[in-house]
Amino acid sequence: MAKLQSSFKNMLLSLTLIALVAAAALAGVYMLTKDPIAAAMTEKQQNAIMQVLPDVEGDIRIAEAEESNGVTLYKAYVGEEWIGTAVEASTEGNQNMPFGGTFRLMVGFDQVGNVVNYEVLEQAETPGLGALMTTWFKSKSNILGKNPATTNFSVSKDGGDVDAITASTITSRAFLEVVVKAYNGIAQQPMPIEATSGATQLTTEEGGQQ
């Protein structure tokens, strides 16, 4: 019996030591990779901002980030002229979205609220569907060049004006709701008088969100 107890203590001690070594190794890996990962994420975010803004001549200056209506705004200027806004929005905090995972988008709008472009910053969707999300809506027959205030940013199955990803209506609904969420962030912001024609915040009943 004493030998059995001794073996049990040795086994417990060994497991404890293994756990401590593993924890220390994980902590070391985290410390080594934390800064490179953060730098890569920042670079991806900055690249996405430039990708979704209007194509204009001159040096684009990005103003300090602003929070609005649950999204992050990056207003862009050439000199003193405001040319558009890149908006970072995600499914996080949206309990009513019919979507099991989470994703983050960077959506670009021009001065009147038309969608210029978008980039997927992060997504936890099924790999095939996630890849489709990055390109599916990038055509003028889909959402580019359109304004959520004048176009129903819902899938056609729900009576909207946007074609859903094939066999993935739920993901398409969630994607479009995030785009409308991004638009509502800029709709609450002051805009030049000549650029206010599309700056009307949407409600669930008005089209963009279901």
PLM-predicted stretches and their roles:
Residues 2-210:
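Flexible, solvent-exposed loop/hinge segments and secondary-structure transition points
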